[in-house]
Amino acid sequence: MTSVLFTCAGQRVDIVGAFRRAGATAVAADANPLAPALYHADVHALVPRIEDPGYVPALRALVEQHDVRLIVPLTDLDQVVLARSRAELGAVVLLPDAEIVERLGDKYLAHLLFEERGIATPPTWLPNGVPDDAAYPLLVKARHGFGSRHIYRAADAAQLGFFLGYTPVESIVQACLGGEEFSIDVFCDLEGRCLNAIPRTMIESKGGESIKGMSIRDQQLIELARDVAEKLQLVGPANIQCFRVADGSHYLTDINTRFGGGFPLPLAAGGRYPELALALARGEHPEPRLGDFREGIVMTRFFSDLSLTPNGDGTLKPLSVDRSED
């Protein structure tokens, strides 16, 4: 079996479980002993925080101890560190080049990158660069990070000034697009070739993550995602977010170089992304199968819970409930 190390495991029980069902041995790492995904892996380990100099050496030790072939980050938090440390880690890191990861993690630099590569994107400015004739409404958005925290809609210049003073984080200003928003989950090989792209509607989101959606067979979106993924030389999973405006054109707003929050939907639609990832770890070269998925699959997500008990050595383990008396 191929061993896979999941970093910043957090709450991504869905991803850890999907890889195990695909035949992987899951090794989950996190700094927080209460991260639920730790306890759904075959092996789990507590590691230093990302900013600690011991973070990468701790991951390398897990790679050596468990013969890890593939490293999969489950949040944006450590992607730059991992992308810069490929040689030291000693396993395939499922991320694009470090420069692409860094630029996509900064919404203003991502906007410039899209323009450089000929990818349509909404007009975007730094706060001191908004032109006087900019059309309102405008969005004030956090420059870094993920989710929908610190996003404000300004109806006029007075509101724009207020929100730029109110927001606690470094921000950008972006044109507010009409039309419908879509997410496209892509998976690319280690050479940046797009193997599949699965569009989905955004029926409902919470905290920036899709919690309700439906897979759709939209050839324009599939081709858009392939073109974007290959222009940027993406590697592994990525979630591409875009708007389709009234004239039918598309504008990219964000790309997350990881499995998106709506990952259960492309998985249920037959995307087989964990199997593709394991094939790459084994040195195989899967052929592209664009459009190979089921349309009309609806996802609705919900919260679950996990009870833990002390393990006797300062660690925790899942609580085993005896129901013999029920």
Give short role names for the model-derived ranges.
Residues 1-96:
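ATP-binding N-terminal substructure of ATP-dependent carboxylate-amine bond-forming enzymes
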Residues 37-40, 54-57, 101-108, 150-151, ...:
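Short, charged, surface-exposed secondary-structure boundary motifs
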Residues 45, 66, 217-326:
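ATP-dependent carboxylate activation and anion-phosphoryl transfer catalytic cores
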Residues 90, 101-178, 190-193, 219, ...:
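Active-site nucleotide/adenylate-binding loops and adjacent lid/helix of ATP-dependent enzymes
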Residues 155-233, 243-251:
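Phosphate-binding site of ATP-dependent enzymes
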